[in-house]
Each structure stands twice: as C-alpha cells, then as structure tokens.
Amino acid sequence: MSQNHTILQSLPVGQKVGIAFSGGLDTSAALLWMKLKGALPYAYTANLGQPDEDDYNAIPKKAMEYGAENARLIDCRAQLAHEGIAAIQCGAFHVSTGGIAYFNTTPLGRAVTGTMLVSAMKEDDVNIWGDGSTYKGNDIERFYRYGLLTNPALKIYKPWLDQQFIDELGGRHEMSEFLIANGFNYKMSVEKAYSTDSNMLGATHEAKDLEFLNSGIKIVKPIMGVAFWDENVEVSPEEVSVRFEEGVPVALNGKEYADPVELFLEANRIGGRHGLGMSDQIENRIIEAKSRGIYEAPGMALFHIAYERLVTGIHNEDTIEQYRINGLRLGRLLYQGRWFDSQALMLRETAQRWVAKAVTGEVTLELRRGNDYSILNTESPNLTYQPERLSMEKVEDAAFTPLDRIGQLTMRNLDITDTRVKLGIYSQSGLLSLGEGSVLPQLGNKQ
C-alpha cells in the first residue's frame, strides 16, 4: 500500500470521515468545515482521564452541534493504566536529564488512543481518519502507525495537510471567525504562553514561550500538582508506602485498589501534592529534530521510584544491567509509535516475565518538594540483600573467609596481566603515553 493511496490530500466528499474530536477550537472548526464541504464527519473522543477536562460527556454533544453524523465517547482509561504499568515494569523511559526521567506519558496515550479510536471507527464502518497532529510533530507518525496496525484498510485525511483548509482557516483567529459566521457563539479562549496535552498518566507542556530555553519551568502552571518552586506554596513532608505484587502496584499506604485507574488517580494525588515527577527535558523527535518540554507525571514517578528500589534489592547486577539497557531501547520504540511492534513486544515480555514477576514488596518514602524524597524502608520476601554477608562485625557462619578472598584476588592476576600487556601495546602504537607524568606512571617501570 503506497503512501499516495493511504494519505488523502483533499477532502473525501460524500464519505464517512472519523475525526479525533477534543472539543477545542481546531477540531470544532475542522468538523464544521468538513460538514459544510460535503463530507460525513463522525466524531470520536477518548476519555483518558485528562486532569484538565471537567465534563467528558459534553464533548460528543458539542460535536453533534457542529454537524457530526454521530459522536462517541470511548473510555480508554483502563487500557491506559494497563500500558502505564507495563512501561513501569520495563523501565521504558529513554529521555532523562540528571537522573530525572520523562515517563513517556504522551506516547503511551497515543498508543491507546490510536488503537481504540480506530477500532471504534471500524465498528461504525468508518475507514477514513483525521486528527489534529501537525506535520512537524511526533503524533502524526504515531497515529499513522497505530491506525494502520488496527485497520489495514484505513485512509488518512488530516485537514491540516489539506491546502484548501489551510488557505481558508489557516489560524486560530480565522477558525474562530468561521464558527461565529456560521451561527456559533464561540469565544476564543485566552492563549497560554505554552500548549498543554494531558492524560491520566501525565501532562506535557511545550511550544510557544517554552521553545526558548531561557523560559523555564516557573512559567508553567501545573495541572497535576503544585508549583513546588514557589516558596509561597506550602508543601509538607509526607510518608507514603507503595506495595507491588509480582510487578504490579496494588496498594498505597496500606489500602489496596482493585481498579488500576483508581490506583493511578490516588498516586497522582499523593505525588501531585509535592510536585513529584516534574521535569524539563530536551529530546529528539522522531524526525531527529530537537524539541523541549516540561512534563508532569506524579503517579508514574512514585511507582517508578518504588519499583526500581525493589528491582535493585531483588535482582543481580547482570539482570539489572539488562533491564536498564532494554528499557532505554524500549522507551525509544514507545516514543516512536512502535509500542506494539514485534521488537518492542519481545523486550516487554522479557522484562515483564523475568524482572517484574519477582518484584513483590513494599517501599516507604518521605516526599518533600519536587523530586526531593528519601527512601525510609524496603521490605520484600524476595530480597537478595543480606547485610550479614558484608557485615563489618564478627558473625557466625560467615559467607566467606579472608582466605577465600585471597584466592579470588589471586585469580584476578590473570586479567590484570593481560591488561598490562595491552596497555603496553597501546603505548608502543602512540595511543597512550606511559611513564613519568602520565596518567598511568607506574606502567613505565620496566621492572
């Protein structure tokens, strides 16, 4: 199937066109414009537990007012929680600065939205899909991939790639005037200094003033937590416990949650009271151009900290290393819209089976301001951390003796000798300078 047959560059008049409808200015104007130009628009809205959305049920009603043939609200929260837990289990986070990660909350949301909305469209025999993503961003490719994975007969029509739409409604002012001219009392909201996209797992703030690196996190008004950098905002230390069973978070502060959606919402409330999980990242988009974002993810951060504490106390060094390497690779695949590709499923299955299954236990933390926290206690029946093995005190039945360590160190002579030989080779070839004043002066001793 060639791109020319898949991507429609002009409006398919007389045909059903599904649109991912948010109720905002862009999708409202696009839906009405498509209707007036002769298409049959069908509106689909994903309920992702967006923290900045007050009334989900009002969105489909608004779509019908703008001329949709039908409008549906698709509850995606349970699937989003499932994918969020999978990302935690795999450590699927490749973007970080100074050890603080971006939890790929937007890519996770796109994986769920792209598959579930297109599945709903198939039920209505709608095989043309449009959304609000622009040609410069990541989402246009993510939705393209997930849409075609779900429905191989899908065709893509995006008003923002249609030159006629751009010529007639090229900006927010033109779209607002278009709605008013057609009898809709649309009052354009005051534009923020940045744009925000959110779901139950996290929020993304980017563009506009945030494109400039001298505009920092302080211009952002958090929607999932507090502005912890503001000294006038009171943030009190708080102890919280997180319990996992076979890699799945199941309880907060001793209270079990059968519904993972409710679990995430409570984790967001707890972490949000402190601004936990906020970060400022420069990242590489799919097309290899750099962008900048301010991110919130209080619940994901809380689960990630507790999960990794248990991972390090349960698994050996080689397993932890592989978990981290695979997590970086999987995070990038997730970011690229390949969360359901075979190479991603292989990495996911490895972590979920061999890492997560052993992660049972409870971690207690003290949360303070932002990403400032302390781990107070770690408990697990599977801990391989046994302090008596390395105790500096005299213990009965020691795991090993001084003579055992002498033998172990003696065996190291083999690779130390090999390393000295190689360093000599590097010196002779000019790669290393050995002897007096060099980094390794002792190697210049011919004796």
Swiss-Prot record:
Q: Which GO terms describe its biological process?
A: argininosuccinate metabolic process; L-arginine biosynthetic process; urea cycle
Q: Name one GO cellular component term.
A: cytoplasm
Binding annotation for ATP: A20, F21, S22, G23, G24, L25, D26, T27, S28, A46, G132, T134, D139, D197
Provide the disulphide bond pattern: none
The protein's Enzyme Commission number: 6.3.4.5
**Pathway given in the UniProt record:** Amino-acid biosynthesis; L-arginine biosynthesis; L-arginine from L-ornithine and carbamoyl phosphate: step 2/3
Query: How is the subunit organization of this protein annotated in UniProt?
Result: Homotetramer.
PANTHER family in UniProt: ARGININOSUCCINATE SYNTHASE (PTHR11587:SF2)
Supply the name of the protein.
Argininosuccinate synthase
**UniProt source species:** Neisseria meningitidis serogroup B (strain ATCC BAA-335 / MC58)
Please name the taxonomic classification of the source.
Bacteria, Pseudomonadati, Pseudomonadota, Betaproteobacteria, Neisseriales
Name of the gene this protein is made from: argG
